[in-house]
Regions:
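Active-site catalytic loop in hydrolytic enzyme cores
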Residues: 84-154, 168-175, 233-246
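Conserved hydrophobic/aromatic positions in well-ordered beta-strands
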Residues: 7, 94-96, 103, 208, ...
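CN hydrolase (nitrilase-like) catalytic-core segments centered on the catalytic cysteine
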Residues: 60-78, 145-225
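Short beta->alpha transition motifs characteristic of CBS
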Residues: 46, 94, 105-111, 208, ...
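Cys-nucleophile CN-hydrolase/nitrilase-fold catalytic domain and related Cys-dependent amidase chemistry
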Residues: 18, 23-98, 103, 167-180, ...
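Extreme N-terminal starter segment of soluble prokaryotic enzymes
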Residues: 1-8
Length: 246
């Protein structure tokens, strides 16, 4: 299996303005080639707003945009959006292939301190996305604090987190991403936003990619709108797999 080339886009988000955010990411994605997976932050069309789903772009509009970008870059495009569905509002992590296949995972652990559980419906299913020979487990922000939910039963190679993780708790973000890689003997990638949102929350970013030994192989500078690239190796996974924990 060839290596997996992953790109994380650590960017600010325009508060509650879907079209403006899509235009911003149009510019960020321009000219990116030769990657397998390109990751945008959590709620990349709105920022972490409790009322975002009610005024958000329709899922079809977001999926059409992501499909066009996936085709343009010949890569899996991944990121979460606030969406209104028939069964309620969800924080939905969409992963869209160039061929138009759409995978999604609805955030399981909602952030009660911001009343997310009062505005959004929790998902109840883990999802594994197979892409170019790699198995990817999509997870969203607060999910990171629940290790059993990401337990690797030899069913994934990369745990992929998108987040709006506030700056005051950035040490937890960094430590827990490393812990998840070590305990699950898998690659972990975390794509966090930067800037400030409409609620006055500040975000450092600290996006990173970590190998199964817990070593950081790519990291973004704090507070910088930037992109980071890494290549994951199946050989490194096999080496870690000699001592399977679970």
């Amino acid at each position: 299996v060839p290596g997996l080339k992953i790109t994380l886009l650590q960017q600010p988000l325009v508060w509650m303005d879907g079209p403006a955010n899509l235009r911003h990411f149009d510019r960020q994605l321009e000219g990116i080639t030769g990657r397998d997976v390109i990751v945008l932050p959590e709620m990349f069309t709105s920022g972490f707003a409790m009322e975002a789903a009610a005024s958000s772009l329709a899922q079809d509009d977001v999926v059409n945009w992501m499909t066009a970008k996936a085709q343009q870059c010949n890569a899996l495009i991944a990121g979460s959006v606030a969406l209104q569905t028939e069964s309620g509002s969800v924080n939905r992590f969409l992963l869209v292939e160039p061929g138009g296949t759409v995978h999604f995972y609805d955030k399981r652990h909602l952030f009660r301190m911001a009343d997310e559980h009062l505005h959004y419906k929790a998902g109840n299913a883990r999802v594994i996305v197979e892409w170019r020979g790699w198995r990817i487990l999509p997870l969203v922000c607060y999910d990171l604090r629940f290790p059993v939910w990401s337990r690797n039963l030899n069913d994934y190679d990369l745990a992929l987190y998108v987040a709006n993780w506030p700056a005051p708790r950035s040490l937890h973000w960094q430590a827990l991403l490393t812990a998840r890689a070590i305990e699950n003997q898998a690659y972990v990638a975390g794509c966090n936003r930067v800037g400030s949102d409409g609620n006055g929350c500040h975000y450092r970013g600290d996006s990173r990619v970590i190998n199964p030994q817990g070593e950081i192989i790519a990291t973004a500078d704090a507070h910088q709108a930037t992109r980071i690239d890494a290549e994951l190796s199946m050989m490194a996974l096999r080496d870690a797999d000699e001592f399977r924990l679970w």
